[in-house]
Amino acid sequence: MFKKLLDNKNLVINPPVFITSILLIVALILTCVLFPEKVGVWFPAAQLAVTSNFGWFFVVTVNVILIFAIYLAFSKFGRIRLGGDDAEPEFTKASWFAMLFSTGMGIGIMFFSIAEPVSHFFNTPRPVDTDIEAAVQAMQFTSLHWGLHAWGIYAMVGLALAFFGFNRKLPMTFRSLFYPFWGERIHGWWGHIIDILSALATVFGLSTSLGLGVIQITAGLEYLYGWEISPMMQAGIILFVIGIATISVFSGLDKGVKILSNANMYIAASFMLLIFILGPTLFIMKGYVENTGAYLANFIDISTWNDTYLGSGWQNVWTIFYWAWWIAWSPFVGSFIARISKGRTVKEFVLGVLIVPGLITLLWMNVFGGSALHTILSGDVTMIAAVKADVSTALFVFLENFPFTKFLSIVAIILIFSFFITSSDSGSLVVDNITSGSNGESPVWQRVFWSFAQGIIAIVLLWGGGLDALQTAVIITGLPFAVILLVMCYSLQKGLKEELAKSSKKAKSKEEKSYKEIIAELLDEPQSK
């Protein structure tokens, strides 16, 4: 059977990566289906083991990656251009930023923009004496989770893939990041293992986001219309969205994802603007400035906090989950960012990925989270009760504080759908590239296959344990990948150093040639060819 599969001319795959990834995914799905009760015990135990014993390692990893990203931007490597000295950007900066934001955050900001700040308010990371202190701390840690560290991870993974893909002409997969160490051996089994891990991390990271999206969509439909949530309803919504994403897949990167990302930005900007205008506008403006300042002022403290002395377990549930999620999400986001960033310099790339989407994300969290906290501080504790009861309905309970509640709720659901489709479309492209090593040259149906595979995994994990199962899958796949990212940083610096030396040698050669031409002209001698 496998021989026929490999001989199929309509397939463009890297067999060891493609087949092994599918077998491991199928094994997980069968385990969840056949042993649901045991999975309900295994998943929490696995999550606790990883977060309790390796939480510190996640903290170190994300900080090292962010520091390294900032160093590269302002170092001598910052002037290196992705794709070579003559490469030009394929997308305008507006479209580039739109695709960065839609792919990098998407569904997550819809799910957590209300639930997280409110949750941190009534369950603070550190002990506080007043509600005001609780609100300040809630926004600080929300900013930590959605700010520079997340985008620093994406920036470094995207930069490494873009550099080795465009400048070294290697496959745009994670095995290529180890070329400075292994050379041509990246095409052997060690390279296959790296790509298999990145494929699994991408699939489970995507499935988590898709799962969060369908949980919130069904919660919104139940809250608005009283529809009863059932596993079949969740599965139907996932398959419906995957079907729409398939249409986008056939349109290609330049049309499908670009158009969807731009549409996402327009809808998201309009939605945020409405909340900003209809909500406590002055409070939001003042809060954005103050919260961003507090985040930066306490940056070292909160970003290196390990819950060592309190031992409350709070960090394991929140911060470590986020660091693992961003790391597991990074092969997908990084690969996609790399594909759309040809022609950018290293400095432009890093600062563009870090600053613009980061500021927009923090603005979003302040508009929504700040408004929710303002409601609570004004004496209305409905939001606290809503988050405690069901975090997935928090956004829709929040919108009841505004006029045009029904309209705003429908816009929110449309936006979640839109982010859902974008993630599925661009995610299928990335997983297909990893498992085929084709840099986008594989047949469309392979991307469609991975699109449906992500949906099925999300369905199985939801049925097997809901949000807890999704979080556990992310944390477990994020741990080995954190090690890969640290090695990636060293490998990238080595590659950039070689690139800079090569460019300097080429420039010196051109300079020497020009001197010879000038002398030849002065002596009126024919130039040697």
Curated annotation (Swiss-Prot):
TM segments? 15-35, 54-74, 94-114, 146-166, 186-206, 233-253, 265-285, 317-337, 349-369, 402-422, 456-476, 477-497
User: What is the superkingdom listed in this entry's lineage?
Assistant: Bacteria
Recorded GO terms, molecular function? transmembrane transporter activity
Subcellular location, record wording: Cell inner membrane
Give the membrane topology, semicolon-separated if more than one.
Multi-pass membrane protein
Question: Can you supply one Gene Ontology CC term for this chain's record?
Answer: plasma membrane
- Annotated keywords: Cell inner membrane, Cell membrane, Membrane, Transmembrane, Transmembrane helix, Transport
Q: Which InterPro entries match?
A: BCCT_transptr
Instruction: Classify the main location.
Output: membrane
Q: What induces it?
A: Expression is induced by HHP stress.
Kindly give the PANTHER family that the UniProt entry links to this protein.
Answer: HIGH-AFFINITY CHOLINE TRANSPORT PROTEIN, HIGH-AFFINITY CHOLINE TRANSPORT PROTEIN-RELATED
User: What family, per the record?
Assistant: Belongs to the BCCT transporter (TC 2.A.15) family.
Q: What does this protein do?
A: Catalyzes the transport of trimethylamine (TMA) from the environment into the cell. Binds TMA with high affinity, but does not bind trimethylamine N-oxide (TMAO), glycine betaine, carnitine, choline or dimethylsulfoniopropionate (DMSP). Together with the TMA monooxygenase Mptmm, is part of a two-step metabolic pathway that improves both growth and survival at high hydrostatic pressure (HHP).
Q: What name is this protein filed under?
A: Trimethylamine transporter
Q: What is the lineage of its organism?
A: Bacteria, Pseudomonadati, Bacteroidota, Flavobacteriia, Flavobacteriales
